[in-house]
């Protein structure tokens, strides 16, 4: 790839980055803020991504934008259709890009283009009420500014700059759909011809908000329902029925203590790296009216696994339920597909110059089957700009400085992997 083919992206970004040490901005604030974004291809691309709503199952428009942009940079771009595996008829697709005919590159860099609801419009904010500030402190707010359109934008420009400096760099880009609710995009890629055995890539770099640190590990996941079956009756004669809600409550109360119980006493598993497994009772519903003894009740529960497998945790849950119910099957855990869930994930952190942390959230990483060989292990890195603490919140936001630093961080990871 030639520098001219990139529409001078590298030169423009370098110029924008050089502004980092300029004097504080004073003047027409709104004009200054928009000028900062307009003058940077990176920030302009990020703005365009965020301005296009892409809540899970509705990623088509932002996907088309990313596809067109990558094509304009002389990359070979494929649209990997995943619609038949979804609950919506709207077209859904992953975007897979690479240089020339190098369809199976050495290094795969990936993130997701879907977001959680609701859509929050893009906006710019000075870091303080004062009109004087440094451009790198400018705050960019809106849904997806962090999770994960910041990673998408930084990955794209890190790849373009790398290819401008080294046209033979063997890099592939994957931007998938559905990470926030089902993992359908990564699962589809994982089961496709683009993920062969043995693997053609030797490194995968996952883009998620990590506060610009390398992640050593993140917790696994397990979701299930606790179900109680009772018998309906008039509330004036409750002894004629069996309240499913009353049966559910003591079991829920016990499950809620498992994260604090030591494993040897029936509690959830722990590890030195990730600490305690945690359990969250996220939703409870049951009954049809206040004057009817409820015949059915259930709770939706999520466990973040610090150790062991999902099956290990299922066993702990089953034993805990049986302890309270004395084996009464009118209250039971419903795990659905027992193949669902994921164990804790561990990543490589052997590139110098990064802080190393662990995180409690989940990613697409377990959905990508890594076909390690006896003589070659595929390395996995997890890195990205922004904080998970605001990623799904009303105040989701990132600074210009974080976004620009992420480009440099991804370039270092790519360079170390080539």
From Swiss-Prot:
Residues 1-18 form the signal peptide. It is found in: Secreted. Keywords: Glycoprotein, Hydrolase, Metal-binding, Protease, Secreted, Signal, Zinc. GO terms for biological process: proteolysis. It comes from the Eukaryota. Binds 2 Zn(2+) ions per subunit. One of its GO terms (molecular function) is metal ion binding. Glycans are attached at residues 74, 168. The active site is at residue 179. SUPFAM superfamilies: Bacterial exopeptidase dimerisation domain, Zn-dependent exopeptidases. It holds the Pfam family Peptidase_M20. Its main location: secreted. GO terms for cellular component: extracellular region. Zn(2+) 2 binds at residue 147. Its EC number is 3.4.17.-. Belongs to the peptidase M20A family. This is Probable carboxypeptidase AFLA_000940.
């Amino acid at each position: 790839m030639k520098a001219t083919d990139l529409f001078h992206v590298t030169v423009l970004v370098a110029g924008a980055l050089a502004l980092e040490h300029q004097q504080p901005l004073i003047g027409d604030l709104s004009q200054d803020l928009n000028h900062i974004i307009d003058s940077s291809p990176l920030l302009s691309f990020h703005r365009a991504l965020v301005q296009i709503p892409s809540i899970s199952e509705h990623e088509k428009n932002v996907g088309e934008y990313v596809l067109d942009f990558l094509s304009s940079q002389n990359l070979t771009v494929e649209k990997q259709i995943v619609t038949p595996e979804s609950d919506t008829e709207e077209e859904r697709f992953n975007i897979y890009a690479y240089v020339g005919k190098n369809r199976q590159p050495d290094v795969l860099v990936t993130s997701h283009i879907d977001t959680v609801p609701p859509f929050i419009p893009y906006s710019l904010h000075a870091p303080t009420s004062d009109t004087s500030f440094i451009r790198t402190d400018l705050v960019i707010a809106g849904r997806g500014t962090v999770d994960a359109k910041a990673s998408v934008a930084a990955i794209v420009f890190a790849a373009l700059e790398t290819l401008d400096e080294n046209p033979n760099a063997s890099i592939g880009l994957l931007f998938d759909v559905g990470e926030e609710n089902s993992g359908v995009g990564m699962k589809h890629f994982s089961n496709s011809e683009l993920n062969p055995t043995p693997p053609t890539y030797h490194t995968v770099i996952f883009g998620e908000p990590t506060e610009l640190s390398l992640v050593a590990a993140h917790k696994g996941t397990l979701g299930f329902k606790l179900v109680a079956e009772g018998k309906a009756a008039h509330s004036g004669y409750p002894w004629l029925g069996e309240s499913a809600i009353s049966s559910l409550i003591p079991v829920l109360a016990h499950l809620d203590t498992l994260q604090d119980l030591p494993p040897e006493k029936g509690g959830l598993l722990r590890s030195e790296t990730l600490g305690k497994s945690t359990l969250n009772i996220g939703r409870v519903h049951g009954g049809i009216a206040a004057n009817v003894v409820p015949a059915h009740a259930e709770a939706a529960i999520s466990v973040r696994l610090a150790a062991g497998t999902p099956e290990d945790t299922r066993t702990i849950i089953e034993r805990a339920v049986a302890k309270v119910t004395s084996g009464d099957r009118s209250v039971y855990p419903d795990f659905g597909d027992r193949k669902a869930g994921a164990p804790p994930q561990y990543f490589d952190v052997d590139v110098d110059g990064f802080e190393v942390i662990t995180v409690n959230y989940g990613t697409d990483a377990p959905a990508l089957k890594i076909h390690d060989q006896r003589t070659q292990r595929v390395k996995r890195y997890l890195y990205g700009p922004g904080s998970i603490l605001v990623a799904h919140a009303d105040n989701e936001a990132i600074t210009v400085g974080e976004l620009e630093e992420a480009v440099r961080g991804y370039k270092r990871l790519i360079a170390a992997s080539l």
